[in-house]
Regions:
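A short mixed-secondary-structure module that forms the rim of ligand-binding clefts
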Residues: 45-84
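Membrane-embedded alpha-helical segments that form the functional core of polytopic membrane enzymes
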Residues: 192, 198-225, 281-289, 333-352
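Interfacial loop-to-transmembrane junctions
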Residues: 292, 416-446
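Intramembrane alpha-helical segments
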Residues: 241-242, 246-333
Length: 460
């Protein structure tokens, strides 16, 4: 009915408006009252024609928008990508819904803009709902045409609540739950072990990668589920997939998904066992124990300050050695030694997350290495992990187990230095993202280490 009530020109303008909403995460909010004008960028998301976002509460000189909106809820806003091809200007009325700690509407924003969680963690924020009253859409992506003006009537709202409503795609929630960005940890360890073997079977390597990635995905999903059930993850948590926190999936469905992934990984493991023998099964069972009981009861290695050791073993020596065995049908100390740098940097990723969350974990009564060491000790621990990764690489080259191509990893030294500076300056913004920048270091270090082994194998 909404589509029939609108002219073709209006419908075209609304579709352009929806595209602007979809492709942007921030808007410039302009409020004014009694001669005071304030403008700044705020995170936002559109739902059913309304715009939801957060502004600062009045505290320590902050809260300019709050003071203006309380006296005058009429605002202006601009949404653009700093490129004058398609942008939106608008007028509307803002309703301050309440403190972000108390309003469930925060999850409407967090689903699309998880970066907003970071600001909610460090600044006092209020959730707002903006009802647009007039929109001006400029769309020069295909042709030069006049700016379209849209009076936001009930018919327009019905269009956003009907034909233009964003329909969540179920697969996206599952994909978000597996946290695919972390898969390079598994990828590099498996490639390293395989490339070190005397002979290489590409079909077996692909099967090993499939099993390893399925196992990694299942561990990520199950960890989210058990962290949520234990109460370790709250709406302010930065390290989880947020699938449960933001209500994208019910807990039972996520648990089922994790179990299905684990069964698929087990199927691949049994296939490799049939092809290469029982040692594959023993290594897989050891890795499965460390992964599944990382967060799940009754063990919960993560909460007994054993998470670092579990992650090191599972994603370092065990994975590389298992991959090597599948190719060589035998064991060697070489993949164990060369996987140590990758395992250490994997711990550093985890530690970066725990380091940032020391206060939260301590309040919740959870024990991690970071919470036991404190801020100063955690910085030194992080330094040791990173420096040791490079040190072991040098040792491996010195004993002849890694070709000189392995020196390529030192191209990442600048990233390591940047991260170390952040680790000893907790008040810097970079410290908040220590886990992410450490993951970046791991990616490039792992890529260059595997490339060095590959070059030594095929180039000499």
């Amino acid at each position: 009915m909404a589509q029939e009530a609108l002219t073709p020109q209006m419908w075209e303008a609304l579709k352009a408006v929806k595209e602007v909403y979809r492709k942007n995460k921030t808007l410039t909010l302009i409020s004014h009252a009694e001669g005071r004008v304030w403008a700044n960028k705020v995170f936002f998301v559109e739902e059913d024609g309304y715009l939801y976002g957060v502004v600062e509460r009045p505290q320590d000189g902050r809260g300019h928008h709050y003071r203006n909106i309380v006296q005058n809820p009429n605002v202006f806003f601009i949404i653009d990508r700093n490129v004058p091809d398609r942008f939106l200007q608008g007028e509307g009325q803002v309703e301050l819904l309440g403190d972000v700690t108390e309003r469930h509407e925060r999850h409407i924003l967090f689903r699309k803009v998880p970066q907003a969680v970071l600001f909610a963690k460090f600044f006092p924020l209020l959730v707002f709902r903006l009802r647009p009253t007039r929109l001006y859409i400029s769309d020069y992506t295909e042709e030069w045409k006049p700016r379209a003006r849209v009076e936001v009537t009930e018919e327009v709202f019905k269009a956003f609540q009907g034909p233009l409503k964003t329909r969540p795609r179920p697969w996206r929630a599952y994909w978000q739950g597996v946290r695919s960005f972390s898969f390079t940890v598994t990828l590099f360890s498996i490639l390293l072990g395989a490339f070190l073997a005397p002979a290489l079977s590409w079909p077996l390597l692909l099967l090993t990668l499939a099993g390893g990635l399925l196992a990694h995905a299942s561990i990520n999903v199950l960890s989210d589920y058990f962290d949520h059930r234990r109460g370790a993850d709250t709406w302010l948590t930065l390290g989880s997939s947020r699938v449960l926190l933001d209500g994208l999936l019910p807990p039972g469905r996520l648990l089922l998904f994790g179990m299905v992934l684990l069964l698929l990984a087990a199927g691949v493991g049994l296939a490799l066992t049939a092809l290469r023998g029982l040692p594959v099964l023993y290594l897989a069972l050891a890795g499965a124990f460390l992964g599944v009981f990382y967060t799940s009861p009754p063990v919960g290695l993560k909460y007994r300050a054993l998470g670092d050791l579990a992650v090191f073993l599972a994603f370092g020596p065990l994975m590389a050695l298992g991959s090597y065995y599948v190719q060589a049908e035998g064991f060697s100390p070489v993949p164990v030694l060369l996987s140590i740098p990758l395992g250490l940097l994997t711990i550093a990723i985890l530690h970066g997350n725990n380091f940032r969350d020391i206060m939260d974990d301590s309040r919740a009564g959870f024990r991690t290495i970071a919470s036991l060491l404190g801020f100063r000790g955690s910085g030194i621990y992080y330094l040791g992990l990173v420096v040791a990764a490079y040190g072991v690489t040098v040792v491996a080259i010195g004993v002849g187990w890694l070709p000189l191509w392995g020196l390529l990893v030192f191209l990442t030294a600048y990233l390591a230095w940047r991260n170390l500076r952040a680790a000893f300056q907790p008040r810097r913004v970079a410290f908040t993202f220590l886990d992410l920048v450490t993951a970046q270091l791991h990616f490039y270090f792992g890529l260059l280490l595997v490339a060095g082994v590959a070059l030594g194998r095929w180039v000499g």
